[in-house]
Amino acid sequence: MSRVLLTTSLALLLATTTASASKAPAKIVVHEGDSLQAAIDAASPGATIVVEPGVYQGDGATRAITITKEGIRLVGAARRNQPVVLQQTGTQVHGIWVSPADSTDPDNPELPPCGMRNEQLHGFSVSGFTVQGFPGFGIYLTCVDDFTIRGNTASGNLTYSIFPVRSSHGNLSRNQVSGTKNDACLYVGQDESINVHDNVATDCIIGFEIENSHDVRMFGNRAINNTAGMLVDIVGNREVTSISGNVVAHNTFENNNRPNTASPDEDTSQIVPGIGLILEGADDTLIQRNRFIANGLAGMALVSPCVVDPAFCAPPIDFDPNPDQNRVVKNTFEINAADVFYLPGAGQGNCFAGNDPATLSVIGEPLPVCK
């Protein structure tokens, strides 16, 4: 290669490298006493915001912090005995709120405007935070595609501690969630293609919930000392009106006998303590290799909401309430009051096989065997 060509090639390489470096997402470091929201507002899409240990309260009146930019990585640099805490203050209802800009103040957080238009925010992650004391949601995502919520602690958030809704391709892992007094610790609602693994939920009305969602993989989680360990269900008045293709495997549902403390005006106030897993109206769910231990009413329930509460299915309804094609296989039931509560109503194609003990104690109808 001639010196001219070599010089030209090096110049082009240098120009390309410089251009790439100039486009690299920025890293912003936030220290205790700094404004988290100011750092978010200053960040470019794709930026990483590293938050040093300390107690932060956020600047928002309703939402402590709000993120409407794509690709933001929020990293709590927690160290041993030095957490990164987002603490509720004043009139704040929600902790970390992530959504497209048009959906920061929806009339109903479960019916976000972005969901009606199939608009999405692409890319978000949060890790290493302790989010506590919010009367609404601890961590809320709506219409977010490609997200990660990993290694956080959410406690004392009264409605939902971690709540992705109308979102897709997400990973929720290694979170510790507790003290949600009105509803679910971790709630996957109207979502698609979500992995939920190795989380712990305790002291909530519902430990984990999958509602009106598809292709959710719930594995390796522990639901302990909740009113109900987990709920897989379908409800009306949602943008997504079906639920199917979900897998609940290798989880532990233990001692879910907590008294129900939900406000009387909440639907969740009707949940009777003592069931590890409630599958209500869902279709095509695989319940496999879970452990159900010391639940005071039943290890699990597979029911039609129309049987449990006929008023729930009073016409008109915009969903199919019958639980169909659910498989319950190779699970272990230990010292529950009953193993299975089975009232499928008009549901068809449900079956049980390979569970331990081989003969399960049942409340309701005889269990159909998988062929």
Residue ranges and their predicted role:
Residues 24-34, 53-60, 64-66, 70-135:
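Right-handed parallel beta-helix/beta-spiral solenoid domain characteristic of secreted/periplasmic
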Residues 40, 60-63, 83, 89-94, ...:
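Short glycine/acidic-rich loop motifs that flank beta-strands on beta-rich extracellular proteins
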Residues 272, 308-371:
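Acidic, glycine- and Ser/Thr-rich low-complexity intrinsically disordered tracts
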